[in-house]
Amino acid sequence: MPEPVKSAPVPKKGSKKAINKAQKKDGKKRKRSRKESYSVYVYKVLKQVHPDTGISSKAMGIMNSFVNDIFERIAGEASRLAHYNKRSTITSREIQTAVRLLLPGELAKHAVSEGTKAVTKYTSSK
């Protein structure tokens, strides 16, 4: 009767033989890819408006998605406007018009005034 073949011992969960997922074949750790988000800026604005209020990570994820969505919409509309006018550069004028087209009534007015204020502050600091 043939003897049963023994396989190599399986390393236990916490053993040193288990290979770390973040390690390459040569033993060096891989650098984690950086995830860009607006969370730092959302948090700064939150603290300006409501200093005693916090935000959950789920809510921060939603806010990040919202900012990305609005950014893409404005950029797309500004790009279209530049193309219609046979321009190769998106200026603050295209951005302002895109905001007026995308945002409703009073919200557009406030966004335009805040944007103008931010551009003025930026140009004066140069």
From Swiss-Prot:
Residues 1-36 are annotated as: Disordered. The modification N6-(beta-hydroxybutyryl)lysine is found at K6, K12, K17, K21, K35, K86, K117, K121. The modification N6-butyryllysine is found at K6, K21. The modification Phosphoserine is found at S15, S37. The modification N6-acetyllysine is found at K6, K12, K13, K16, K17, K21, K24, K86. Gene3D superfamilies: Histone, subunit A (1.10.20.10). The modification Omega-N-methylarginine is found at R87, R93. The modification N6-methyllysine is found at K47, K109. Monoubiquitination at Lys-35 (H2BK34Ub) by the MSL1/MSL2 dimer is required for histone H3 'Lys-4' (H3K4me) and 'Lys-79' (H3K79me) methylation and transcription activation at specific gene loci, such as HOXA9 and MEIS1 loci. Similarly, monoubiquitination at Lys-121 (H2BK120Ub) by the RNF20/40 complex gives a specific tag for epigenetic transcriptional activation and is also prerequisite for histone H3 'Lys-4' and 'Lys-79' methylation. It also functions cooperatively with the FACT dimer to stimulate elongation by RNA polymerase II. Phosphorylation at Ser-37 (H2BS36ph) by AMPK in response to stress promotes transcription. Phosphorylated on Ser-15 (H2BS14ph) by STK4/MST1 during apoptosis; which facilitates apoptotic chromatin condensation. Also phosphorylated on Ser-15 in response to DNA double strand breaks (DSBs), and in correlation with somatic hypermutation and immunoglobulin class-switch recombination. Keywords: Acetylation, ADP-ribosylation, Chromosome, DNA-binding, Glycoprotein, Hydroxylation, Isopeptide bond, Methylation, Nucleosome core, Nucleus, Phosphoprotein, Ubl conjugation. One of its GO terms (biological process) is nucleosome assembly. Its main location: nucleus. One of its GO terms (cellular component) is nucleus. There is a cross-link at K35, K121 (Glycyl lysine isopeptide (Lys-Gly) (interchain with G-Cter in ubiquitin)). There is a cross-link at K6, K21 (Glycyl lysine isopeptide (Lys-Gly) (interchain with G-Cter in SUMO2)). The modification N6-(2-hydroxyisobutyryl)lysine is found at K6, K13, K21, K24, K25, K35, K44, K47, K58, K86, K109, K117, K121. The modification N6,N6,N6-trimethyllysine is found at K86. The modification N6-methylated lysine is found at K117. It is found in: Nucleus; Chromosome. Glycans are attached at S113. Changing H110Y: In a colorectal cancer sample; somatic mutation. Belongs to the histone H2B family. Core component of nucleosome. Nucleosomes wrap and compact DNA into chromatin, limiting DNA accessibility to the cellular machineries which require DNA as a template. Histones thereby play a central role in transcription regulation, DNA repair, DNA replication and chromosomal stability. DNA accessibility is regulated via a complex set of post-translational modifications of histones, also called histone code, and nucleosome remodeling. The nucleosome is a histone octamer containing two molecules each of H2A, H2B, H3 and H4 assembled in one H3-H4 heterotetramer and two H2A-H2B heterodimers. The octamer wraps approximately 147 bp of DNA. This is Histone H2B type 1-M. It comes from Homo sapiens. The gene is H2BC14.
